[in-house]
Amino acid sequence: MNDWQWLKNRLVNSKTKSVSFWLPQTSSNIIDIAELIKCCSELKNTSINGLIDFLNQQDKLEFNLTRLKEIDVEDGKQLFGIETSVYKHFQNEIARFYKQVNKHFRETGSESLFLALPVIEGINEFNDIFRAPLLYVGVKLKVSPRFERFWLEINKEEIFLNPTIIGVETNKRNSLFKNNYDTTKIDVNDALKVFSELEYEFRMPLTSELKSFSKKAKSDFNTEKRTNYLINNVLLGIFDVKGDQLFQNFNEILNTDPDVLDELLKDRRDLLLENREFREQFDLKDTYLFSHLDIYQQYAVKQALLGDLIIEGPPGTGKSETIVNILVNLVLNNKKVLFVSEKVTALDVVYNRLGSFKHIALFNASVAAEKKRFYNQFAEFETYFTTYFSKKDLDATLPTFEGKWVDDILGAFQALQALYDTKINSGENLFSFKEIVSSFQMLDASYIKIKEYERFDEWVRVFSNPLWLEKHLSYQELKKELSQRWNGIDNFYQLQSLLNQTKKRKVLNYVLEHFEQFNTVISPKHVLFYKPSNKSQLLLKQLKQDVEQYTSLQRFQSPTKFETIKLNFINQVNENPTPWFFSWFIQFHAKPLLEKLVSFESNIIKTKQAYLNGIESYVASCKKLLKTTILNNFFQLYQTNKDELLEICRQAKNPVLKEITWWFKKHFELLKKLFPVHIMTLESAATLTPNQRGLYDYVVIDEASQVFLERAIPILFRADKYIIAGDTKQLKPANFFQSRAEYDVDEEFEDGNIEAAVHSSSLLHFLKNRSRILTLLKFHYRSDSADLIAFTNNRIYDNELIFMNKANADQRVFIVHDVIDGIWKNNRNLQEARDVVQRLEQLTTTNDYKKSLGVICFNKNQADLIEYLIDKQNNPLLNEWRERQNDVGEYEGLFVKNIENVQGDERDIIIFSLGYDRSVNSYGPISKQGGENRLNVAITRAKQRIELFKTNRGEDYNGLSSSSLGSKLLVEYLLYCEAMAKNQGEKITFQAVKRKETKAKYELAVENDFFNQLQAIFGGEFEIKRNVNEGAYFFSFVFYFNNIPYLAIDFNIPIPTSRKQVMEGILYREQFLKKRQWNLINIWIDEWKLNPIGVISKIRSSLAVHQNQHEEI
């Protein structure tokens, strides 16, 4: 058994740093309203007692700020410390605070807005100095259009006794303590009685008058006297006291079943799981698709079903879409799922992507703030059921996917490779068929007459003999001589025949003498009385010589062979026989092989398309099954729990909505059956669901790098298996039990308090090396331009990401604004902030106003300053831009944030306000440990463009030689932005990895020829580049028109040797290119050689289609 006490100790110690334990001063999230209550509220009795009585009896507390106009400057300075108009000050302050509350709600799903009173302060027995409100009353802030009035709607169902101070005390004592405070009313005396049970005593104020909240440091407390005080302060602010439910859950688990932490956090690594083998054997069996995922997303979904999985999702790699598919798979496998995140925006994205299938999930990010939305989900489900229900739809065939397509594609490629590798023997040489078909020239080889191509080299030897040629010419000369001598060649042939047939010399002499006299050849059988003459003797001798000579040359008489040898010499076949063999073989012997070649290549194309069509059909079938499951969930409950089901479905129509906690407690099992997926924040899950082991089959936690391990334990405890998604190279948790939006980042860094958070483990970091499986998403979709992600891919992700330009990406991706007279002073840069706001106003007059935009600062004060200047401008267009939502209600307005608060956000345009000038040696959070992760988050938010505002040249900033990785990368990134803005990106060395591929000489020769032909035919209209690296991919050729890629060509593509290569390197490479709007065609090397006209036609057609698409755009 492990000792997890350290975890508890860290949790408790961290709570002493939260604003519900130690509140030194007001902040942007907490304001003092004691004097406002006195000056401009409707309250008649403005004492603490009068306020409490009012809050217990009324539902709303109103404020009229116009009353502040009556306060002169001197009184304003005395009461509020304000030297300007008190009315204007608080009008602006309430406006700012109202926006801050709404901003917090957008990011967390909970307003966490409380009226907090009174404040207690002192020192506990463990020497922890505390100062925080005693009681918290949930309120909702409402304002008039011009912020002249505001009111607080009081939620009496959200009354809390400070849980943090009590929690720290009881945990440090290791004691069980029952908090018996009656949360139905506000009662200071009852609250103090609870504290007295823990031996806390407080010195009470002399009067009940409300007091202003003053700034205090821990050094102001007397640690020797240890006197505790109660002060009649009243604060309005964002307090995360509801998050203490997780704190309580954790303590319950640790106190009642400490051994369970060993089980929850044990090392589950599957040492027998061979990831390479998994990918090689991967198929979609038992896996459903809600959308056409890329292959790495499919890996993650399939592995998720095994449970205890970590999904590393770098920026823009489709993590949310992956989670959607995981949830659908779990539902279709009849599992109950809890899906949580610290960020409500992450929950919104996943829920909205379910679209019309959202009825598998119950969304409840906030326990108190979204009652109407909560109950509407049931009413909408009832409407969906009545609209689509029919009994025939309750049965659905389980969809199946033909995984053999991948095997078929691989088989076709392997067959093609085998065909390419087929050895062709010319007699003395072996050639591969690919070399022959790739290198052959169309030569006139029709004169080569051989049946067996294996005898070609022998034929070349025979028919390239110069001696034979000489002998043939001698034969021809001799034949002429014989024709002249014997008065015609036919006479010679007759005489030759007679000489060969007749052995009688006398007869031969007679014939020759007769030939001499009459010039004819006779064939006498007998010459009885003939006596040979000398003349005939000489003629016989001559004939014998001629016949002997003729016979010796007769085998060289063939005119066909003569012509063949002559052609061979003319064609220099003997000197270079290979091209002639290739051409002759292709024309007269390769027909069966060529037919196979065409068949294999055609089969690859058809099967690839069949696979893609099959995926689309499979997605449709899976959605049909999901619809059936949704209808069945409702139908089965309608049959078994009709009254209970209809009661909750009709709740949305009631004017007074019951508390969500009440419904969860009463109908929890029904809610799980009706909605197999529950989507909540961690706090909502802890508040609404029982702290019970195995409550769900799976828990899915998103953005887990920002979840502290302690906060996650109660959530992990509720499920049998976990699926954790996030990115260890993004932000770690900000502050225990407090969102990043709730604390002052700069102060935290200046105080050094953040170091504890930096060194602490997030859930993701802790479980990364303990989970059963770790999988990585690789395809990057967010950035339209590869340049936007290239830096972080190289510097942060070791070139693991797969990315490339969108075909229609803007050409101007980086804009650098050099700020004149910018100065870093008082932790901000005023001139730079002014320039940023001026730029925003300029963009409202351009087409960029239609886009989404965010401003990211490297310092909170700079962000606050820019927000202030925007507020001051009160530009209607900027105001509209700031409040913009998309079609499904997701916030996509103009934001201004520091780097700590932008994880999970994305915008078309990101504007950076660096703030710092060259005098700075430390860049705040960036220079601290983990600063590189903060930078990574910031520079990966843009989809289309980045604009950088800075005061000095990049090379003037300190940091390149810094020991801080964050500082070093920041300055490198400034230099990168400058280079890209000046179109000097080729000077940057950290681009995508280039493909290194060795090619045979004959392949290079064909490729050169192909390129030359492309240039000759298309070069006048298009810029054609060769060996192009686009992001993470390589292309043989790319056609550009006005710098827009119209067509990419893979020429002579490498043959895959595994299923993994087929899926990752071919099918989903091509699918990714389609999503990036690239037009790609494959040209086989043999296709070009065998049918160049057809290839050119194919290219023309592809260019025409893509040109039409661009014209439509």
UniProtKB/Swiss-Prot annotation:
| Disulfide bond entries | none
Name this protein carries in UniProt: Uncharacterized ATP-dependent helicase MG140
Q: Which residues bind ATP?
A: G313, P314, P315, G316, T317, G318, K319, S320
EC top class, in one word?
hydrolase
Q: Which CDD domains match?
A: SF1_C_Upf1 (cd18808)
State its Enzyme Commission number(s): 3.6.4.-
UniProt KW keywords: ATP-binding, Helicase, Hydrolase, Nucleotide-binding
Highest taxon listed in the record's lineage: Bacteria
Stated family? Belongs to the DNA2/NAM7 helicase family.
Please list the GO terms describing molecular function.
Answer: ATP binding; helicase activity; hydrolase activity
